[in-house]
A protein has these predicted regions:
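Short, acidic, Ser/Thr-enriched surface-loop or helix-capping motifs
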Residues: 24-27, 90
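Charged, gly/pro-rich active-site loop segments
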Residues: 3-4, 57, 83-146
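Extreme N-terminal tail/first-helix region
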Residues: 1-18
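Amphipathic alpha-helical interface surfaces
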Residues: 9, 58-65, 104-107
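A short mixed-secondary-structure module that forms the rim of ligand-binding clefts
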Residues: 40-79
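A short, Trp-centered hydrophobic/proline-enriched beta-strand micro-motif
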Residues: 13-25, 71-76
Length: 146
């Protein structure tokens, strides 16, 4: 059974292009990065793409962390100098690397629809990992519900 996410919260999630992903390693050491994502109403997806990475040759820290500890958090936010306009959505959930090619292709399609840059990248299964985050809790704060 999937978590019910209200229409205003779904619109807020869909209206943003970048979120922050928080992972933790097996020892609980946190790691936060900005990331591009797609949301289908029940899950958040992201891909390890061809953008330059700080490190090459081994799985990225976010992937290593998810494999060691699948509990993650995602924050999507609006900042404004007028603090009455502040808003965020905090999603906590379980992350997993997609292992079925059919789901991978569906998620990749969502990402390519949202980000034209992905349409020209050579992204393929299983070389470019796609991660699915299934929300277990969603918290909205501020001007989200408008």
């Amino acid at each position: 059974m999937s978590l019910h996410i209200t229409e205003p919260v779904q619109r807020f999630i869909q209206s943003h292009k970048v979120a922050r992903l928080a992972t933790a390693d097996a020892d609980g050491q946190p790691h936060v990065i900005p990331f591009c994502y797609a949301f289908d109403g029940t899950a958040v997806y992201f891909i390890v793409d061809e953008k330059p990475k700080r490190q090459t040759g081994k799985p990225l820290k976010r992937i290593r962390n998810i494999l060691a500890n699948p509990q993650v958090a995602v924050v999507i936010d609006d900042y404004a100098d007028d603090w009455t306009q502040l808003a965020y959505v905090l999603i906590t959930g379980q992350a997993a690397i997609i292992e079925k090619e059919e789901e991978y292709e569906r998620a990749l399609g969502l990402l390519r629809e949202r980000y034209p840059q992905y349409r020209v990248m050579s992204l393929n299964f299983p070389h470019n990992a796609v991660v699915r985050i299934v929300p277990t809790k969603v918290l909205a704060w501020g001007k989200v519900e408008q």
